[in-house]
């Protein structure tokens, strides 16, 4: 067992039960952070928390929360406060994806996507940015997406939520730096990543993306944490993703949207 060497360091990760979120947990545990694991799946959270506690000698706290519900972010914040925990590292990783034609997807599903991807993330960032600034600093990593760099037909609301996260996070990072707040705000923009989100039937149509085009969740999480701790405001993990992000500046938005629309309609099952 590796003993905790980061006393008084606590990280909160939303969407911690699977995929990139679970990898964030493993990496932070290895760095000696005490952990607050947040997601909807209590069994998965408890299993992961037990493994991390046993392997790394850290404290783990499980909070079951549906971040699409009203006041969920405030309820989560107060639950953490009641435990007397001082969060130094916040990772807003929870996210929902719904694919398909906008008019054919239910409005409720799309509002839920906005609630989690935008409202909950914004609320938690506001609550913890203020608290961290008042207590001497900290780190906030907001998981956006390469989808936020472009308009994507058949995935339009999701892409729009991630565009919000990207713009919001980069501008806030500049604000906090200019104010000498001691709070590092970072946007992580992964591309296609090998997680359950890619083939989750709840998302509607699924994308048939070759494995060769995907990064592992572990790679994405490693780059995100390292970049945030190094003071970067933007992280696009992987050479292929960096190339994709760069070419968005060389095509007109109209042409790029047409190309993406054709690609997504062909690759959606």
Task: Label every model-predicted segment.
Residues 175-240, 250, 254, 258:
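SDR active-site lid
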Residues 145:
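Residue(s) in the substrate-gating loop at a strand-loop-helix junction
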Residues 93-98:
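Conserved NAD(P)H cofactor-binding loop of Rossmann-fold oxidoreductase domains
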Residues 125, 161:
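Active-site helix of classical SDR
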Residues 17-18:
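Conserved glycine-rich cofactor-binding loop
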Residues 31-48:
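Conserved glycine-rich Rossmann-like NAD(P)H-binding loop of the short-chain dehydrogenase/reductase
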